[in-house]
Design a protein with these regions (language model features):
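Short amphipathic alpha-helix that is part of the acyltransferase structural core
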Residues: 1-30, 127-160
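Conserved donor-binding loop and adjoining core beta-sheet/short helix segment
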Residues: 27-80, 191-205
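A conserved beta-strand-loop-helix scaffold within acyl/acetyltransferase catalytic domains
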Residues: 56-60, 162-183, 187-208
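Acyl-donor-binding surface of acyltransferase catalytic domains
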Residues: 68-132, 267-269
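Conserved acetyl-CoA-binding loop-helix of GNAT-fold acetyltransferases
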Residues: 70-82, 209, 215-229, 251-255
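Conserved hydrophobic beta-strand within the GNAT/NAT acetyltransferase core sheet
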Residues: 88-90, 204, 238-242
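Conserved active-site alpha-helix within GNAT-family acetyltransferase domains
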Residues: 93-111, 220, 244-262
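Short hydrophobic clusters on alpha-helical segments that form packing/core surfaces
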Residues: 204, 225-230, 238, 249
Length: 271
């Protein structure tokens, strides 16, 4: 079998109808985006008799969305770098059958992320550090510097790549916050936060601090500014994903008052 490009949305629908049987295991959460991905020539299929992989072309690898009905039918795709995300409820634990199946297909465990949430009235206010200035990016150069930092700081396979084509929109919408301080009259860039708003919930999409500035509460300053800028009422809501392994980040969010909502994601990769 070889990868086959999906040319029409109707073909995507056929795959969903055929393989999306009752009781199947699936992580296909691109249904709202599928038409756009097809128009961009970035959606491919790799289908067996009972199982199917949908693959989205990324920068140097493929992100895999699966429909699994038979854990004995192995889909083996050699010579390609693959990444997939398994969503699960923390209290129930990882779906062992899905993990074991993907391991048979050549995938290995990679990272675990946990989802946290908070409401404004439950979040703690911290004392402002007057040396650290947090403001929305004012230029495209500032937005570019932020995403260069994000790309250097985060896992290339399971992170969300943002195309430079949307930088201008992020600038106009004040979606990128920059942290800096004056150093001998010059602005010293320390870190950045990228936010998105979905269904009246403010999300931390990316946050990173330059290596030489870590340990000086720059991340906390960015988080505080993000919360205050998006406060509409005491019931304003905020959400984020954080790497389970990043103990410093977990402590920062929990100190602020964010709580784990019982939802996690395991990424697996095949190199």
């Amino acid at each position: 079998m070889k990868l086959k490009k999906i040319e029409y949305f109707s073909r995507y629908q056929e795959i969903v109808e055929r393989y999306g049987q009752k009781g199947c295991a699936s992580n296909d959460y691109i249904q709202r985006e599928a038409a756009d991905i097809i128009i961009q020539d970035n959606l491919y299929e790799f289908c067996g008799a009972k199982n199917a992989f949908l693959l989205v072309k990324k920068d140097g690898f493929w992100r895999v969305y699966y429909y699994l009905n038979d854990f004995d039918e192995v889909l083996s795709l050699d010579g390609e770098v693959l990444e997939t995300e398994i969503l699960f409820r923390g209290g129930l634990g990882e779906p062992a059958e899905v993990v074991a199946y993907l391991e048979k297909c050549g995938f290995k465990r990679h990272l675990v992320r946990d989802q946290y949430a908070g409401m404004y009235k439950d979040l703690k206010s911290d004392v402002e550090n007057e040396e650290i200035i947090v403001q929305p990016a004012q230029t495209l150069t500032g937005v570019q510097a932020a995403f260069e930092l994000f790309n250097q700081s985060f896992d290339k396979y399971s992170g969300d790549y943002v195309s430079p084509e949307v930088y201008e929109g992020l600038l106009v919408n004040h979606s990128v916050l920059l942290a800096w301080r004056k150093n001998e009259g010059e602005a010293q860039f320390l870190g950045a936060l990228h936010q998105t708003i979905e269904n009246n919930v403010a999300w931390v999409s990316h946050v990173a601090v330059k290596e030489e500035a870590r340990g000086h509460h720059i991340g906390q300053a960015l988080l505080d500014a993000f919360v205050e800028r998006n406060m509409v009422s005491e019931k304003s809501r905020y959400m984020l994903w954080v790497q389970h392994q990043n103990e410093a980040a977990v402590r920062m969010y929990e100190k602020k008052g964010f709580k784990y909502v019982g939802k996690s994601s395991l990424s697996m990769i095949k190199l």
